[in-house]
Amino acid sequence: MAIAKGCLPSNVVPAKIKRWLESEEYSCVQIFGELARNTLFSYVVTLSPEREFVVFQPSNKNDSIHIAGALVLSADQIKKLRKKSKDEQVEIFMELRLKLASLDVEFSFEGREVCRRIGINHTIYFDGLTKDRLLKAISMFNKAYSLASWILKKSI
């Protein structure tokens, strides 16, 4: 099968992405084994001591790359959230939904009676994959993460 002009062959994508991440001085570590299950490659990238995300290619979607991570609520935030009424909790997470919906990310709220973490994912596709597109995707993830963090700090 011919590769379209400007597209990278899939066998060079992992090394190219690692090189792009390192050229921006991101700490980037490839993960293997159970932690990287169902992926063709997976890198943990550290933006700051409190912010990490994963860049990976799912084994069942060989035309896409995901930038994903989670904002984990602290024990103190969970405690404060529990003290709020159900209506107040719904209002906080409705605001989060409305603000995150305007960004090009998928998100999920995880937890039983109280949300404990917010999953954030941004997908990019191989056709025309460039360093610019990868870094813009990371920026979008970072904006969504920051926005969710700020709203939680303000609301809880």
Placement of each model-derived feature along the sequence:
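Charge-rich, low-complexity N-terminal segments
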Residues: M1-N62
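Ordered, soluble secondary-structure elements with a strong preference for glycine-centered loop motifs
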Residues: N11, G128-L135
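Short glycine-rich, low-complexity/disordered patches
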Residues: C28-A36, L98-G119, W150-I156
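Short hydrophobic interaction/assembly module
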Residues: V55-K79
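Glycine-rich, often proline-containing surface loops adjacent to acidic residues and nearby aromatics
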Residues: D63-A68, E113-F126
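A generic structural motif
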Residues: L73-A75, I124-T130
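Mixed-charge, glycine-accented linear interaction segment located at domain edges/termini
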Residues: R133-I156
